[in-house]
Amino acid sequence: MPIRALCTICSDFFDHSRDVAAIHCGHTFHLQCLIQWFETAPSRTCPQCRIQVGKKTIINKLFFDLAQEEENVLDAEFLKNELDSVKAQLSQKDREKRDSQAIIDTLRDTLEERNATVESLQNALNKAEMLCSTLKKQMKFLEQRQDETKQAREEAHRLKCKMKTMEQIELLLQSQRSEVEEMIRDMGVGQSAVEQLAVYCVSLKKEYENLKEARKATGELADRLKKDLVSSRSKLKTLNTELDQAKLELRSAQKDLQSADQEITSLRKKLMILQGTLSLPPATNETVSRLVFESPAPVEMMNPRLHQPPFGDEIDLNTTFDVNTPPTQTSGSQHCLPKKLCLERARSPMQNVLKKVHKVSKPESQLSLGGQRCVGELDEELAGAFPLFIRNAVLGQKQPNRTTAESRCSTDVVRIGFDGLGGRTKFIQPRDTTIIRPVPVKSKAKSKQKVRIKTVSSASQPKLDTFLCQ
């Protein structure tokens, strides 16, 4: 078994790979560890017992005799020493690695700082270049402005000289002879004075020509204004004449308007009288029937006949048409239809008369001032609008007085009665029954006459078969 001794300095077991040294006190250490101890310690003492040690008292190397069979056997202490040395190396490597990693991190930080510095310097360089280009442009602009300023100064100096010359010319034009002579004397003698005098002479000549032209233009303007004044006076005279004529026309128009108002008033009164005259007063159906049958047949009720086509086209007689046959009617309705048509035709002139009466009663602004119509023309027009039986029965009577007609119109009564054609109608019944004189006929004779007239009228009316035969 090997000696299980260890070095108290490095705590490693003794082996044959390193030398073992001893001190005179008897303690043993690794030679390398003992030398390093003496170099680092403040005094040369034993690391274990602290006794003073001299250089001569140190045994540098001890020799141990080992057995032959034990040389090839691995010792646990040796392996432990190797393991400790490997661990120490590993820890050293780890420490070196950590130091290297710290150095690498430091270098990386330094590199990033340098990159940031380079980037900032690059940005600063770009800004400096932009600033330099801007300054160059500004310098160029300032040089241009300087040139413009120089030109402006020259122009200002030239204009100042010109203004001074103009002031002198103005003074020359406005001043008296003595002042002009004094100014000429102040000019002195020389080429510049001669040039100045020449300029003054040219300016005076131009001013004289301008004054001549202005005088000529002023004379022409005065002549034109005189002519305009004469023409304006003549126009004013004409307008005054026209104004007087217009005033006269206005007065005549006012007189015409007053006469038209009087005419409208008279026409309204006559219209009221005519409305009272045209009222049908009888309360019996016999008078209406008599007036209807006494009237001649209207033009529209003539016998129908075939006419020439309007456009001259030929008619194809072979063409067939679907004609809807009306239902058969009773004899009473067939007899009453023509009379009803006759009554409707007879009523149409009455409607036209009412329309004409409404036209007469329009506002005064629609009447023409110059075109007046007399009363007789209106009466003739109204009389021509009525059918013959109305004129014979009503208009043929004597015109009653205006006061009686107005009193009669105010006492008339509107009634509803039979119209003699199977229907009802409204009529105005006057209180004075002497307007229409009914024919004195007995009641039985009236009924017989009515039946006979109905048969005659129905027989005289055209039929469909006679129309087709024609």
Swiss-Prot record:
One of its GO terms (cellular component) is perinuclear region of cytoplasm. It catalyses: S-ubiquitinyl-[E2 ubiquitin-conjugating enzyme]-L-cysteine + [acceptor protein]-L-lysine = [E2 ubiquitin-conjugating enzyme]-L-cysteine + N(6)-ubiquitinyl-[acceptor protein]-L-lysine. Its EC number is 2.3.2.27. GO terms for molecular function: identical protein binding; ubiquitin protein ligase activity; ubiquitin-protein transferase activity; zinc ion binding. Disruption phenotype: Early embryonic lethality due to proliferation defects and excessive cell death. TRAIP knockdown substantially increases LPS- and poly(I:C)-induced IFN-production in mouse peritoneal macrophages at both mRNA and protein levels. Keywords: Chromosome, Coiled coil, Cytoplasm, DNA damage, DNA repair, Metal-binding, Nucleus, Repeat, Transferase, Ubl conjugation, Ubl conjugation pathway, Zinc, Zinc-finger. A motif (PIP-box) lies at residues 461-470. Transmembrane segments: none annotated. Detected in testis and thymus, and at lower levels in spleen. InterPro entries: TRAIP_ubiq-protein_ligase, Znf_RING, Znf_RING/FYVE/PHD. Signal peptide: none annotated. A zinc finger (RING-type) spans 7-50. PANTHER family: E3 UBIQUITIN-PROTEIN LIGASE RFWD3-RELATED, E3 UBIQUITIN-PROTEIN LIGASE TRAIP. This is E3 ubiquitin-protein ligase TRAIP.
